Amino acid sequence: GRLPIGKESDLFTKTFEKEIEGLIGDGVELKQKLVTEMEQQGVELAGMPVPALSEYFGDYEVFSAEEKLYEPMEGVEYLFKGFIDLVVKTNDGKYHIIDWKTTSWGWDARRRSDPMVTYQLTLYKHHFARKHNIDPKMIETHFALIKRTAKKDHVEIFRVTSGPRKTENALKLLNTALYNIK
């Protein structure tokens, strides 16, 4: 199915209040002014992602939300762990992995192409494809920026390329990091 339209602010408020209660229950000290500002921004922005998804992808169905990846890695005894914010499937049979990011104004070209930022999606794609036995050519990755302080265009979705070479580089970097931790 599709994401519901019209009740996003209510859903956000309920979820936000539950998270705040959990933090308070855990003994976290919160600054009320920041909590209030954050809630106001969230209510304001809550209804914007669904229309942005429809505009960007046209017809789509939600394949999964907050999908847990806990997948074996090749050549090491570790598991890859991650949570994919949203996966939609479009009429052409492609899967689109979407990672939501909040920001004040957006990202510049350097940030959009920074391997340390984009490798997250590359690794999600690799492990999602293996988990579901899907050809990686049928999976695309995207960042969706929710811009809190923008005057217009509060949601920006853009594709991040992640072919075989980039996947190889991301896996190599991850394995090197794991080796250095041992």
Question: Where are the regions that the model predicts?
Answer:
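Residue-level signal for well-ordered alpha-helical scaffold segments within enzymatic catalytic domains
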Residues: 1, 48-51, 96, 123-130, ...
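Short amphipathic alpha-helical segments and their helix-coil junctions
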Residues: 17-20, 25, 97, 103-106, ...
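Generic recognition of stable, solvent-exposed alpha-helical segments in well-folded globular domains
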Residues: 37, 116-119, 123, 169-176
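Metal-dependent nuclease catalytic regions and adjoining charged, substrate-binding loops involved
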Residues: 126-182
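Non-catalytic protein-protein interaction segments used by genome-maintenance enzymes to assemble
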Residues: 64-122, 128-129
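A non-catalytic, helix-rich entry segment at domain boundaries
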Residues: 1-68, 72
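Short helix-to-loop capping/linker segments positioned immediately adjacent to catalytic or ligand/cofactor-binding
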Residues: 33, 52-55, 74-75, 108-112, ...
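Residue-level signal for beta-strand positions within conserved beta-sheet cores that form or flank
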Residues: 61, 93, 137-139
